Structures are given as structure tokens and as C-alpha cells.
Amino acid sequence: MVILGKLMARRLFLSSLLTLILSLMVAGCGPKPKVTVAPAFRPVAAETVYIVPFTGALVPETFSETVFNDFVDLLNGRRRETGVRSFAILKDEVGAVDVGWLAQQHYVSGEIWSYVEETGCCATNIRVKVRAYLTEPGKRVPSVEIFLPMESFFEHDKSTIDLERGRLARNIARELAVRFSAALSPRR
């Protein structure tokens, strides 16, 4: 009887350990934030960097508005670090802006996609991916690309979906602003 108990405890321990290891391996396979900077990119003090409204398919409008507006506000708060005099919002989509004029400007564009809310009886997980680009004057290919996959998990008795959407949107805006500021900083 004692031997059977030790054997059972050992199997339980080993199966728990195997489950933990496999869980860590699977969690490590998810997408990671990534900043790609072209080798030829050298930050320069720019008068104005224009920011084009981010595109978003199947993303709640208030969510994408919060990401975009907070991102612009945070970038403007970091102007001194970046050497940029101002970050200005272009009111039109990229396709509506004069291509010749835009090609002569520094501008940021981006997209929010893969927004998923998985709700169960007691908790919700929100996942979203964001990609933003900085394109320099005269270049067709962006010089800086930032990819951010982010998520928020919460229990329904601790928070609400609206609060968590707002929190996640503000976190994304903050991460984008920090990473763009670092890329634009002359002290890179």
C-alpha cells in the first residue's frame, strides 16, 4: 500500500512537471514585440513628423481611437527626446493624401488587427496585434517598423470589459511611443 502511494505520488509529480514544461514551451512560441530599424536609418531632427490614422479591421472603434490619440499625445510629450519639433495628425487616410507631398515627409502609419476577445463564465482574455511604421522622405520602404502583440486577461469580478479595453489600448499607445522615441532619439 505504501509503495503504491509513492508510485502514484511520483507519477503525479512527473506529469505535473511535464505539463509545466510543455506550457512554458507553448507560451514561448507566441509572437514577441519586435522593432526593426533599417541599417541606413539615422535619426535627424525633423520639423514635423506626420501621423496617419491607423487602420483597423474588426477592432472596436473606441479601442483604436484610444490607441491612436494616446500614442500621438505621448509622442508629443517626448519631443525633446526625439529632436522632432511636433507630431501632427493627418486627418485623411494614406490613400487620400497627395502621394507626392507625403513622399517628401517623415510620417508614421500603422494598423491594428487580430483583435480577439475570448470570454468565459468568469474571465476574459483580449488579444490584439499592432504594427506601426516610420517612413522617411524619399523612401518607399519604412525605415522603422514596430510590431506589438499584446493581451489582457482579467476576471469578471475584478474588472469590466470596458475598463480592460481602455487599459490595454493605453498600454499599447505607451509601448509604441516608448519604442518610437527610442528609435528616433539621436542618442541611439
Predicted regions and their residues:
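Surface-exposed short loop/turn segments
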Residues: 92-143, 153-159
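A structural detector for beta-sheet-dominated domains
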Residues: 38, 52, 131, 149-151
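Sec-dependent bacterial lipoprotein signal peptides
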Residues: 1-29
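Short beta-strand->alpha-helix linker/helix-N-cap micro-motif
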Residues: 76-101
